Amino acid sequence: MSQLCPCGSAVEYSLCCHPYVFGEKVAPDPEHLMRSRYCAFVMQDADYLIKTWHPSCGAAALRAELIAGFAHTEWLGLTVFEHCWQDGGNIGFVSFVARFTEGGKTGAIIERSRFLKENGQWYYIDGTRPQFGRNDPCPCGSGKKFKKCCGQ
């Protein structure tokens, strides 16, 4: 039996993010790039993360930091809860929750990532981390309060 993709799509990894991470295909949209980048974190693939960061971001300088982070972070799951495009389809946004453990503590990254399409290729630019009140509904869509879900 084949392994399911870590991106949470419920599709086999070989049919989902693998072709993007291994350069067999180019991610067709920001959501696929976001999911494949999450897989690269899970698989500890700094090369793919750097390759898919926009060149203006200078991501190659972050290689040592990325690799160091791999050693003590275990990724637990990804939930994409929104994606949209702007500027004629050349700028995209993906909002997600990525759960992890680090140093024995569970955490979550909640981010709205920004992507740019240049020469037929999508690149990660940056992300913003919205602030949520403890009693706000969790953005992951669970129906729980933030403090009882991703805010723990």
From Swiss-Prot:
Residues annotated as coiled-coil are none
Q: Which InterPro entries match?
A: NTF2-like_dom_sf, SEC_C_motif, UPF0225, YchJ-like_M
What are the boundaries of the signal sequence? none
Q: Which Pfam families match?
A: SEC-C (PF02810), YchJ_M-like (PF17775)
By sequence similarity, the record places it as follows: Belongs to the UPF0225 family.
Q: Which PANTHER family match?
A: ADENYLATE CYCLASE-ASSOCIATED CAP C-TERMINAL DOMAIN-CONTAINING PROTEIN, UPF0225 PROTEIN SCO1677
What's the protein name?
UPF0225 protein YchJ
- Which organism encodes this protein? Escherichia coli O81 (strain ED1a)
